[in-house]
Amino acid sequence: MLKEIESIMTASNTEDLKKQLSKILGNYDIPHFLYGIRIPQVNKQTKDMIIEVYPQKWMEHYMKSNYIEVDSVLHYSLNHNLPIIWRDDIFTASQQMREESKEVGLEFGISFPIHSVTGENGIFSIASPVGKAVNNEAFMLTSTLLPYIHEKIKDLERHNRFYPNIPQLTKRELEILKWAAIGKTAFETSCIVNLAERTVVYHLTNIMKKFKCSNKGQAVAFALTHKVIQL
C-alpha cells in the first residue's frame, strides 16, 4: 500500500496522477474511475472539477442527457458520508441511465462521498464490467487511497482556475479577522487590540480587497472555509 500512496503523492501533474491511478486500479481489474468535486470560491460561488477515466462517449451522453439531475448515486453522495455500492434498486430515479451505463462497462461500482473540512463536496467512484473486481479488497484499497488522492489533487490544482489562491494576511489582519469572526464590531475590536477604530476598519478593508469580497461577512466566511482562521 505504501508504494501506491507514494506513486500518488509524487505525481507531477493531473495527467500523471490519472496514469498512476489507472495503473493502481487496473491491477484490480478496475478500468474506470471518476473524481468529481465542487469547490467553494469567493462570494459564495462554486466551481466543479472532474478528473476521470470513463468512456468518453458516455461522459458526453451523460452531460447531454442532463443525468446529473437524476443520478441517484451522486445525490446520495452529496448528502451522506458512507460509501455506496451500486445496485439496481438504488437507481430508482435513474433507471434508464443505469441500463445505459451498463452497456459501456459501468455496471459494478462503489462511490465514496467526499466532504472536506475546507468546504469541498463531491464523489469518487470506481467501476468495472467485472463483478468480482468490485470486492472487499478494492473497497479497502480505495478507502485508504482517497484522502491522498484528494489532497494531491488540491495540491496540483491550487494555483489554477479551480482552487482559489489564498492571499497571505499579516499578523494584525489575522488578529482583527478572528475578532470579526466571533461577531465583534470594529469599535469593539479597536478596544480589544488597542487600536483606533479607523485603523481596524482600514485593516478589514484590506482583508476584503485581498479576498475579493464585498463585505466583512463574506471575508469571514471565506477565511473559515479555507482555514485561514479557526474559531
Name the predicted role of every residue range.
Residues V53-K102:
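Regulatory sensory and allosteric helical modules in signal-transduction proteins
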Residues D155-E175:
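Regulatory hinge/linker segments at domain boundaries
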Residues F108-I114:
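Short hydrophobic beta-strand micro-motif common in sensory/regulatory domains
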Residues T185-Q218:
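Recognition helix of helix-turn-helix DNA-binding domains
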Residues S128-F139:
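Regulatory loop-to-helix N-cap segments in sensory/regulatory domains
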Residues I37-H61:
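GAF sensory/regulatory domain recognition
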Residues H115-S128:
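Sensory-domain boundary capping and coupling elements
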Residues E173-A180, A219:
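Short alpha-helical "packing" element that flanks the helix-turn-helix/winged-helix DNA-binding module
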